[in-house]
Amino acid sequence: KDRSLHYPYHSFDTFIRVLREAAISKEVKSIKMTLYRLAKDSKVVKALICAAKNGKKVTVVIELLARFDEASNINWSKRMQDAGIRVIFGVEGLKIHSKLVHIGTRHGDIVCISTGNFHEGNARMYTDYTIMTTHRPIVREVNAVFDFIEKPYTPVNFKELLVSPNDMRKRLIALINKEIKNKEQGKDAYILAKVNHITDRALIEKLYEASAAGVKIELVVRGNCSLVPGVPGVSENIHINGIIDRYLEHSRIFIFANAGEERYYIGSADWMPRNLDNRIEVLAPVYDKEIQADLKRIVCYGFQDTAKGRIVDGMGTNRIWNFPFTPPLSEEMASLFRSQEKLYNEYKNT
């Protein structure tokens, strides 16, 4: 069974514990990991150093050009190299932004795919999602991504993962095209997504095409959004809500109706040219039904948020739901739906 963590509602200490157990387990042979940003006193790196000292083969891909963290990452790289960890610095012209872990054991491998950095500080302030799986095709392809990082211009055919700059945009367009075709055939057709930014022209134009064909598109977009919803004949089937609340919304979740057999993806990539063309990013499918239900709950709560949500209307107004309030203020406030508070209470009670 797959496992998932939704930070900060779940503690990042659980992930640290996984790394620490891997570092001392006699069953574990190797650990591979991508690192983009690290905490000042990173427990992640300390666990990896412990693993190397215990004889595990540890490989770390670290991005030296992570904005504002260049000096920190250089220092951590030196410490890891001194401990016997094989450190890879990526490829000129491509930032390594994917969030991956591969743990090789004697009886099968485990991989982690995350939407956010393996950073204790971020995990207390950012909403991010991590899945852990032993699904063999995904495990093989995550391992192939590490090979791809070392030889990025070698052709690789990914079937499970969507990987940029390899084929992510092409595969996303194919998924949207399938929704258009299904709508034309009278089948279930919709797209639900939660991202930080949408600015990629090709994907925006494809979403317009899908909307014009009648595909329902519901988006939660926190930051930059070049897509204009609600334009008759173009985007009237697109609705966008943006949430600014206590935690920074950072997870990327994508759900496609697929004629009633929904397809779910999570990963590190926003729908921006830089993510699709100039970074190594990964979106991974999610097959576990319980995790799928959790992801759908997260996205749907995001659409419903009227307490901290704002309507992205294409006019640049970012109108807040139910504002201005009219008396009695307390009654209107009580009726508002706050997605982060709702998720917190539901996770707390499970």
Can you describe what each PLM-predicted range is?
Residues 17-21, 47-50, 145-149, 176-180, ...:
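Short hydrophobic/aromatic-rich motifs at helix boundaries and adjacent loops
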Residues 54-123, 135-139, 165-350:
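PLD/PLD-like phosphodiesterase catalytic module centered on the HKD motif
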